[in-house]
A protein has these predicted regions:
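Short, contiguous acidic/charged loop-to-helix segments that flank catalytic cores in large enzymes
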Residues: 240-245, 284-289, 302-307
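Generic alpha-helical structural element
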Residues: 179, 193, 242, 286, ...
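Short beta-strand-loop
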Residues: 271-300
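Generic detection of short hydrophobic beta-strand segments and adjacent strand-loop junctions
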Residues: 98-101, 151, 285-287, 296, ...
């Protein structure tokens, strides 16, 4: 009897020692968002996985996950959440999500929660802490897990009734040049006439040789496009900006890009805003069109801060150096300062293309004029 008691005591001590030093080994943590690029207030799902890859039974675990401070839970009202606020740094403001569960040997625990984010910006899923007791419940152990998952919220879509009107003449002139006036500088080949080509493209010499109607294939050296340039500097000789005006500019940039997409007009994008993440401090996207191109621009706008990486005059100088035939400019800025007028004039003079400047005040003025006409 004493032998069995000693044996049981030895097993108990061994299990306790093992649980203290090895009990929470081979546990993995991961959190994944169902979407990485979102609309403001769009619901998405964060799925958490805890993997347990050993024979040991874990009867009680508590998980504390650190999520972005502005995370909202529209449906799950029974989850345990506490929010940490700090006036020192926004990064110290967190939403802490608590969960308790147990894990059988070689078992994975999954937990999904529907959430949303209300404002434009870059948010991170960063870390979690897992607490578990030892075999006898005498002391607690903990594992800390680090991850780096980004969630980007695009600028808010704002309806600008006068946007088509303001851009109408600008885009109309480009469309006329693009679709009505070809610039065939080099003939690269010939193809059979299908009936859809204009009569002026028929090559009578090649048609006589081949015994059938042949049309010329051109290398069009002019590719008309629009460069959308977003400035966030609103105070001269300062990198700081007014947040509200800059946020309006980001939404306005989105509206401009949507109009260009609807018109099937190729466009590029650049901004002097500082952007968070791996993209870099100065961001630009080459000309293109389509969903992939559009969402690439939206990602940059979502990452952007209301702080400029360079003065607007330097941004305009870079634009002057990138001038090419057929390139037009839509400049979006919180306001137009007199110190920038010389650079804007230089950009206009350095190209035969058109330059249009849009500010939030442009739409406020247009709206007030419409109200006066209605009265």
């Amino acid at each position: 009897m004493l032998f069995l008691l000693l044996f049981f005591l030895a097993v108990l001590i061994a299990a306790e020692v093992y649980s203290i030093y090895k009990g929470m080994d081979k546990i993995t943590y991961d959190a994944q968002a169902s979407q990485s690029l979102l609309e403001p207030n769009e619901e998405f799902t964060i799925t958490t996985k805890i993997g347990h890859y050993k024979f040991w039974f874990l009867p009680y675990l508590e998980m504390v996950e650190n999520f972005p401070d502005q995370l909202q839970f529209p449906h799950d009202e029974d989850i345990v959440v506490d929010r940490m606020h700090s006036n020192l740094s926004p990064e110290l403001c967190l939403t802490r999500l608590h969960s308790t569960f147990y894990l059988m040997p070689n078992q994975a625990f999954y937990r999904s929660v529907d959430v949303s984010l209300p404002k434009r910006g870059r948010y991170l899923l960063q870390d979690a802490t897992l607490y578990g007791g030892d075999f006898l419940g005498i002391r607690d152990n903990c594992n800390k897990f680090k991850i780096h998952k980004e969630i980007i919220v695009m600028p808010e879509r704002i309806s600008y009734p006068n946007l088509d009107h303001l851009l109408g003449d600008f885009l109309g002139n480009i469309s006329v040049r693009r679709f009505l006036f070809d610039d065939p500088m080099l003939t690269v080949g010939f193809s059979e006439y299908t009936g859809r080509e204009p009569m002026r493209d028929i090559s009578w010499t090649q048609s006589a040789r081949m015994g059938k109607m042949m049309v010329k294939e051109y290398d069009h050296t002019i590719d008309y496009c629009v460069e959308v340039l977003v400035n966030v500097q609103s105070v001269p000789n300062s990198f700081e900006s007014e947040d509200e005006g800059v946020e309006t500019c980001f939404s306005l940039a989105r509206g401009v890009c949507e109009v260009l997409e609807s018109k099937q007009m190729k466009y590029g994008f650049s901004t002097n805003a500082i952007t968070l993440g791996p993209i870099g401090s100065l961001c630009s996207v080459d000309q293109g069109i389509g969903n992939r191109h559009f969402f690439r621009v939206m990602e940059i706008l979502g990452r952007a801060l209301p702080q400029s990486a360079e003065y607007f005059n330097a941004t305009l100088s870079r634009a002057c150096r990138s001038i090419q035939t057929g390139k037009h400019f839509i400049i979006i800025t919180p306001k137009v300062d007199p110190s920038w007028e010389e650079s804007l004039h230089r950009l206009q003079e350095s190209t035969v293309a058109q330059v249009i400047v849009l500010t939030p005040d442009s739409f406020q003025t247009s709206d007030s004029e419409q109200k006066e006409e209605a009265v």
